Amino acid sequence: MDKLTLTRFNDLIYQVLTDQGEHVGNLKLINGVWKFKAIGYAQHGEVIPGGGPLTHRHNMTFVALDEAEIGARLSMG
């Protein structure tokens, strides 16, 4: 997996992008916890919630918005 970066969408949502700019998910602040929501795209651009290359990490939680920790945990195995 490429290096992952976070891009602020608003106060409650950050997009998770690869270093190639591919959108692979969002981090959403839910009840004080950051929850990863995987995103995939079908052949014609349709969004596949919970899909994509990080589908196995869907709903992973984080206590802080730490880009290094988030990237490391999402990229594991």
Tell me the role of every PLM-derived stretch.
Residues 14-18:
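Conserved beta-hairpin
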Residues 8-9, 27-29:
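Generic beta-strand structural signal
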